[in-house]
């Protein structure tokens, strides 16, 4: 405790939890979100063919979590759009990423060192949104733990949960990409973070809110930056989830490996044909050499 007092970690966490997100952190959030939109197949073509549809998709990527959370809590779903500064800022980012001459802005923000910084700033915003969602639900439903968890979860990963609707705006329908069925790391982390913040709001978790925000932000930033740098789509929770599902639900261990193996098996089937093919090629080469000698 004396070491903590000397380092003033409590004061640092308090300052960090009250730090304003606008405009620096919010700009980073918008840039990374719309950058991921541009990575989607056909997104660039849609922006040229129908800029309005592309802009709507970008707004869903930036504000989808607020829209979905407001719908759940009975608030007008377009309530957040009264923040003109945020809408203009997100629209400017969308225009620069998709329509900047020579793609200069996109190349700058997609440059890996810059992208890692932006990803780190985005995770700061994600943690703050999860905490705000749980706090908002706590005021409306003091003892509704499940509602707090769901609201925080939606605030942290609402964009991914609305991905199917966003795809419809681009003329794409991929029901197999349902985020609830195949959760990505940010979605899982948002769920676990919402549970932690709910326990803190219920005074079950013996830690201050500012400290929890600081610690969870450090975890999210370090994990997401590491995964982005390595181009990894895995999850740090995979091993724990595998054992928990095996114990509680009887799921087989190593399901993903077996799944990949089964899918890879048909591709490996033609392998035995290669020796015959090599023999045919060798015999053909031999015949050519003999014919040359005969000539």
Swiss-Prot record:
Metal-binding as UniProt keyword = yes
The membrane topology term of the UniProt record is: Multi-pass membrane protein
Q: Which domain of life is it from?
A: Eukaryota
What InterPro entries does UniProt report for this protein, alphabetically? TRIC_channel
Determine if Transmembrane is one of this entry's keywords.
yes
Annotated transmembrane regions: 19-37, 52-75, 87-106, 145-162, 183-199, 211-227, 237-255
Principal subcellular localization = membrane
Molecular function in Gene Ontology: identical protein binding; metal ion binding; potassium channel activity
Q: Which GO terms describe its cellular component?
A: nuclear membrane; sarcoplasmic reticulum membrane
Listed Low complexity bias regions: 265-276
Which intervals lie on the Lumenal side per UniProt?
Answer: 1-18, 76-86, 163-182, 228-236
Q: Which residues lie on this side of the membrane: Cytoplasmic?
A: 38-51, 107-144, 200-210, 256-295
Q: What positions belong to coiled-coil segments?
A: none
Cellular localisation: Sarcoplasmic reticulum membrane; Nucleus membrane
Q: Which residues bind Ca(2+)?
A: 74
- Binding positions (a 1,2-diacyl-sn-glycero-3-phospho-(1D-myo-inositol-4,5-bisphosphate)): 122, 126
- Note one Pfam family from the annotation: TRIC
Q: Where is this region: Disordered?
A: 259-295
Activity regulation behaviour = Channel activity is activated by a change of voltage within the sarcoplasmic reticulum lumen and blocked by luminal high Ca(2+) levels.
**Which family is this protein grouped under?**
Belongs to the TMEM38 family.
| Summary of the function given for this chain in its UniProt record | Intracellular monovalent cation channel required for maintenance of rapid intracellular calcium release. Acts as a potassium counter-ion channel that functions in synchronization with calcium release from intracellular stores. Opened by a change of voltage within the sarcoplasmic reticulum lumen.
Quaternary assembly? Homotrimer; conformation seems to be controled by binding to diacylglycerol (DAG).
Protein name in the entry: Trimeric intracellular cation channel type A
Taxonomic source organism: Danio rerio
């Amino acid at each position: 405790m004396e070491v903590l007092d000397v380092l003033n970690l409590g004061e640092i966490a308090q300052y960090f939890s009250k730090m304003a997100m606008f405009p620096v952190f919010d700009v980073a959030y918008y840039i990374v979100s719309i950058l991921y939109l541009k990575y989607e197949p056909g997104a660039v073509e849609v922006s040229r063919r129908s800029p309005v549809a592309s802009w709507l998709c970008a707004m869903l990527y930036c504000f989808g979590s607020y829209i979905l959370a407001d719908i759940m809590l009975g608030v007008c779903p377009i309530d957040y759009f009264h923040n003109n500064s945020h809408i203009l800022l997100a629209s400017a980012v969308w225009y620069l990423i998709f329509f900047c001459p020579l793609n200069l802005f996109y190349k700058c923000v997609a440059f890996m060192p810059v992208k890692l910084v932006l990803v780190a700033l985005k995770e700061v915003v994600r943690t703050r949104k999860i905490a705000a969602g749980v706090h908002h639900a706590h005021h409306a439903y003091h003892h509704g733990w499940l509602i707090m968890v769901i609201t925080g979860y939606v605030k942290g990963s609402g964009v991914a949960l609305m991905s199917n609707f966003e795809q419809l705006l681009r003329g794409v329908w991929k029901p197999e990409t349902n985020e609830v069925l195949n959760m990505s790391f940010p979605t899982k982390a948002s769920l676990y973070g919402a549970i932690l913040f709910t326990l803190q709001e219920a005074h079950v978790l013996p830690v201050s809110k500012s400290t929890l925000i600081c610690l969870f932000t450090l975890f999210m930033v370090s994990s997401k930056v590491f995964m982005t740098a390595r181009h990894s789509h895995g999850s740090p929770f995979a091993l724990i989830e595998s054992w928990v599902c095996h114990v509680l639900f009887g799921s087989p261990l190593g399901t993903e490996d077996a799944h990949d193996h089964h899918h890879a098996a048909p591709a490996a089937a033609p392998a035995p044909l290669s020796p015959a093919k090599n023999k045919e090629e060798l015999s053909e080469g031999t015949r050519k050499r003999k014919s040359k000698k005969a000539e």
